[in-house]
Amino acid sequence: MKIDIKFDGKPGYGVYINELKELKFDAKVAIVTNAKVGGLYLQNLLSRIDCPQKFIISVPDGEEYKNMQTIEAILEQLFVSRLDRSSVIIALGGGVVSDMAGFAASIFERGIKFINIPTTLLAQVDASVGGKTGVNNKFGKNLIGSFYQPSAVYCETGFLKTLEKREFAAGLAEAVKMAVTFDEKLFSWMQSANLTDEANLQNLIYRCVQIKAAAVEADEREKGVRAVLNYGHTFAHVIENETNYKKYLHGEAVSIGMNMANALAVKLGLMSEEQKARAAELLVKFGLPISYKVPNASSFYEAFFLDKKAENSAIKFILPRGIGAYEIRKDVPRELVMDVLREFE
């Protein structure tokens, strides 16, 4: 299965599902991975790569290591290995690995080719597609980075067989995000489908990539419709920052963030209580958290202004309109948001 992502005036790329065979290059290749993923899949990947020289760059595992210090370490190894502008970086791992490998590729000698091979469900349905790269800092999540498209993305469902249940569920949160905002039919299907079934899983990834591809093609740099893919993330990024990226996986924080956004949508009359309950039930069915004890509602609210989606001192909220549609709102009164946050205190 293949989905083509196309852009006006410049080359696009393919997202391949269960089609990873041999990769042939006429240049040096650096594979960025971590010890856990490398131990499982690195030898398998190396056997499929035909190139003059291969280098392995291992990065620490975890969102707390997604920072400029790790980027510096990656760049240093690229220089020591004497890679150049003809070289290729391959990201083998989840969203953290692809974010960092892509960012390093975008700034190494002003940009070299990179390929994503995502090994988590979250990365396959969302993070590896679309060219967002970057790292965190003390002010918030993904505040340093670039839009830099990969040359190809290879999603292999076989890589997901070793995922822990919690990691798998975190990926399903991003799929729920797309269903709630774009596709009511997908939402209803997810309510009843056995998503551990290989065929169902492949179909889920395919549909999510279709949704993401359409948004990216229409709005590569997130000025309009692509911002909808941040549904739940405005709240989630604050939660992750408040908990030092250690308590929740990204998808878990997004799950809580979607429930918070849904509560706000109900107050604005965009969503019924019954629809909010349906969304919450699906998240809980997948073993995802939907509640968070907000330490201080005022501080939480102020943290929104560090979000990349804030524009001209206005917070941009991505909110569901029922199930299967969305609204982007920049006019939500502070007190209405505070009411939601106080409900979670």
Show which residues each predicted segment covers:
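Glycine-rich beta-strand-to-loop/alpha-helix junction loops that act as flexible
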Residues: D61, L92-G94, Y231-G232
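C-terminal charged capping/lid subdomain of soluble metabolic enzymes
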Residues: A173, L270-E345
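ATP/NTP phosphate-donor binding region
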Residues: M1-V88
